[in-house]
Amino acid sequence: MIKLKSVIDAVIIRTDGFRIYKDPEKMALIRHYANTTGIIILTDSDTAGFRIRRYLKGAVGSGKITNVYIPDIFGKEKRKDAPSKEGKLGVEGIDNSILIECFAKAGIDISGEGANYVPPEDPITRMDMFELGLSGGSDSSAKRKMLLAHYGLPELLTTNGIVEVLNTMITREELYTAAEKLFDNMEDR
């Protein structure tokens, strides 16, 4: 994912391999993006990668999908002790220049010139998470779970992931309003 973040400015949702099959919250998030902004599916070029790609395409339904395919490049990734089962490099193992070429072949402009995402004027930050008690407090974990459930997001999202996703879904003001409603009765319990 680190390599991918250096190539494209987008919300990146890891499927964690076949775990996506049993993660309805993460699938709900993927469907949300497919039906609003559209999604890009980028998987390894091995059998498992294509099986996951087919599953995502079927699970998303009528949402907008753009497929990006990496070429079959054989070798061993530096971060691994042995080659993969099929001997192919995965997304994290190929050069950035090849990744950029793959996006271009799929018609995706990652230069920023043609991007239609407009960052929020008043973005949600980690400080907001702290001020709302979503991080740094004794009940922060419970509050995060409530907020994530409210928005139908996977509960395993990190604080940084929550900030990134919420900035594409809601405004800072909407976050504060939701938090006030969700957490208002917590002290009464």
Region locations from a protein language model:
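C-terminal, charge/polar-rich interaction regions
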Residues: E101, E113-R189
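Acidic, glycine-rich catalytic loops of TOPRIM or P-loop NTPase phosphate-binding modules used
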Residues: M1-I2, S6-T36
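Activity-critical C-terminal alpha-helical subdomain
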Residues: I70-L132
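Short Gly/Thr/Asp-enriched flexible loops that form oxyanion-binding sites at enzyme active sites
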Residues: F50-A59
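Conserved structured catalytic cores and adjacent interaction surfaces
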Residues: M1, A48, I70-F74
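Acidic beta-strand-to-loop metal/phosphate-binding motif
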Residues: A34-A48
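Short hydrophobic alpha-helical runs that function as membrane-insertion/retention elements
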Residues: V11-R14, I39-L42, T66-N67
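Short glycine/serine/threonine-rich phosphate/pyrophosphate-binding segments
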Residues: D23, A48-R51
